[in-house]
Amino acid sequence: MNFLRKIVKNCKDEEIPKPGTPSAPPDDDDLWMPPPEYVPLTQIKGKENVRNFCINGEIKICSPNGYSFRILRHILKSFDNVYSGNRRLIGVVKVVIGLVLSASPVPEGMNWVYKLRRTLIFQWAESHGPLEGEELEYSQEITWDDEAEFVSLQIRVSAKQCHIQGRLWCINMNSKACQLWADMGLKTQQSQEDENTSLLLE
């Protein structure tokens, strides 16, 4: 029976692809996802639990035989159970993972690397979210390994509160990134004060 587990199994960065090896993952019908859209930064009406973060996100995918986004989505469906970071910032991590995987990957040896650097404004519903000044340095490897395939996700997310002008984060329901957020069970609600604001509930 297939199951998810965290194991120590390093990807070999030094391996060089053989001639003729594709420089991008194999095509799947749900592989290439367009980046989500952002609404322009507007005056936030509700001032409680608003945090401005400078985000750095990177996901390295190691899969010697290529990988399917269906496997990644299956892995992310168990994200709540394997997440090892700060629980007050799990919502931010889920948002960043969705955004990172919406970008185009850069081949790196046997791996594909997705990166994101952005300043985003998050707003949490009452009693949720990080403490004032709280930051996140999250790094984890999550691995799918069965008799047929091996896929390793090396996730790194850095979130530091900053004062650089950013964009207000809001779910675009027409974006395929919503598939990933739905898979991870991202908990949000629309702000009653601002229709362009998605409040995080975790």
Swiss-Prot record:
GO biological process, one term: viral budding via host ESCRT complex
Any Pfam family hit: Rhabdo_M2
Domain of life where this protein originates: Viruses
UniProt keyword terms in alphabetical order: Apoptosis, Host membrane, Host-virus interaction, Membrane, Viral budding, Viral budding via the host ESCRT complexes, Viral envelope protein, Viral matrix protein, Viral release from host cell, Virion
Membrane topology: Peripheral membrane protein
InterPro entries attached to this UniProt entry: Rhabdo_M, Rhabdovirus_M_sf
Main location: virion
Motif (PPXY motif): 35-38
GO molecular function, a single term: structural constituent of virion
Disordered: region residues: 13-32
Family annotation (Gene3D superfamilies): Rhabdovirus matrix protein M2 (3.10.460.20)
Misc note: Most abundant protein in the virion.
Recorded family membership: Belongs to the lyssavirus matrix protein family.
Record's subunit section: Homomultimer. Interacts with nucleoprotein and with the cytoplasmic domain of glycoprotein.
Comment text on domains: Late-budding domains (L domains) are short sequence motifs essential for viral particle budding. They recruit proteins of the host ESCRT machinery (Endosomal Sorting Complex Required for Transport) or ESCRT-associated proteins. Matrix protein contains one L domain: a PPXY motif which potentially interacts with the WW domain 3 of NEDD4 E3 ubiquitin ligase (Potential).
Known role: Plays a major role in assembly and budding of virion. Completely covers the ribonucleoprotein coil and keep it in condensed bullet-shaped form. Inhibits viral transcription and stimulates replication. Plays a major role in early induction of TRAIL-mediated apoptosis in infected neurons.
Protein name: Matrix protein
